[in-house]
Design a protein with these regions (language model features):
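Bacterial Sec-dependent signal peptides at the C-terminal "C-region" and cleavage site
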Residues: 2, 10-23
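Short, gly/Ser/Thr-rich active-site loops of penicillin-recognizing serine hydrolases
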Residues: 282-294
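Surface-exposed helix-capping loop/turn segments at secondary-structure junctions
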Residues: 47-50, 294
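Short, basic/aromatic recognition patches
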Residues: 39-48
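Short, conserved phosphate/pyrophosphate- and ester-handling motifs at nucleotide-, phospho-/glycolipid
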Residues: 96
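A helicase ATPase "motif cassette" and its flanking acidic/Ser/Thr-rich regulatory loops
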Residues: 38, 147, 285
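Beta-lactam-recognizing serine transpeptidase/beta-lactamase-like catalytic domain environment
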Residues: 22-25, 30-34, 52-92, 101-271, ...
Length: 294
């Protein structure tokens, strides 16, 4: 089955997104005070990690207006500088919820369904899939929601396999949701999550609501706990990806308040060394949320 090839290379974009046109509108709505604070928060975390670069974007949910957009890259061992030329590759972890939403749209799966991910290693005719904890014996039998919370690639793949059965059916559903499989940059990924947050036209409202409950669970019980705020409930997803040069992209994308979203945020950090899942990006997300709710 070729679904796995499509899933593992799911770096898709939104068909209707004219990025250049939207950038002009977004930039004119920047909140300079917020922009300055987010720059401070991001730079502190990058310095702490000695990271190569980082990005943070804040979007107003209902209007889609960008309130802050920062890109920083390492200038030398102690300083960072503003940059627009940053990695745009999106992590599989952030794409997982989109794949799950597509599967929910078929009516063939629900988040409470169980899936056996075994010892964390799953072989198909095309490739061997490994969950991040395979060396600890895997997660065994878990629900789809739990699989999403722990970023189980096996759980998401098996969910896609059950829901669609063929690559053609999977692509057809993504096309129906106006998601294309070309290149998805950081701003477009945030736009996609923002559409989920406001119950946009991406999917049936009941399925979007189910996914939003799952994204809350990611933060309360899954790998997104570093994004948890004491001031307001948040929802979102972590992601990690190793680049060809050996460095890692770690990300968190989410929104708040979870039950009445006002703002969505994406944080992306490019660093060398072990990634610690999306924890580092989640911490930046939390600090931004806390500042905006002080």
């Amino acid at each position: 089955m070729k679904i796995i090839i499509l899933y593992l290379t799911l770096l898709g974009g939104i068909c209707s997104c004219d990025l250049q046109e939207k950038e002009t509108t977004y930039i004119s709505n920047l909140d300079r005070t917020l922009q300055s604070k987010v720059t401070f928060i991001l730079e502190n975390k990058l310095s702490e990690l000695n990271a190569l670069s980082g990005q943070a974007i804040i979007m107003e949910v209902q209007t889609g207006q960008i309130k802050a957009m920062i890109g920083l890259e390492r200038k030398d061992s102690a300083n960072y500088q503003l940059s627009e030329n940053l990695p745009q590759t999106q992590t599989l972890g952030l794409i997982q919820p989109i794949s799950i939403l597509a599967a929910l749209e078929t009516g063939k799966v629900k988040l409470s369904d169980t899936v056996n991910v075994g010892n964390g290693i799953y072989s198909t005719n095309e490739v061997e899939i490994k969950d991040h904890n395979w060396h600890r014996g895997g997660y065994g039998t878990i629900t789809i929601q739990q699989g999403l919370a722990v970023s189980s690639e096996i759980a998401v793949y098996k969910t896609i396999e059950k829901a669609f059965g063929s690559e053609q059916a999977y692509q057809a559903q993504l096309k129906k949701m106006e998601i294309n499989l070309d290149s998805l940059n950081t701003l477009e990924m945030l736009t996609l999550y923002n559409d989920i947050a406001k119950n946009g036209d991406i999917a049936n409202k009941a399925n979007t609501d189910s996914l939003k409950q799952a994204l809350k669970y990611v933060v309360t019980d899954g790998l997104g706990q570093s994004a948890k705020s004491e001031k307001v409930q948040v929802a979102g997803k972590t992601g990690t990806l190793q680049l060809e040069n050996g460095s890692y992209i770690v990300e968190f994308c989410g929104y708040f308040p979870a039950d009445n979203p006002q703002y969505s945020i994406i944080v992306s950090i490019n660093k060398e060394g072990l990634p610690a899942a999306g924890f580092m990006a989640g911490e930046v997300f939390r600090q931004i949320v806390d500042y905006m709710n002080k």
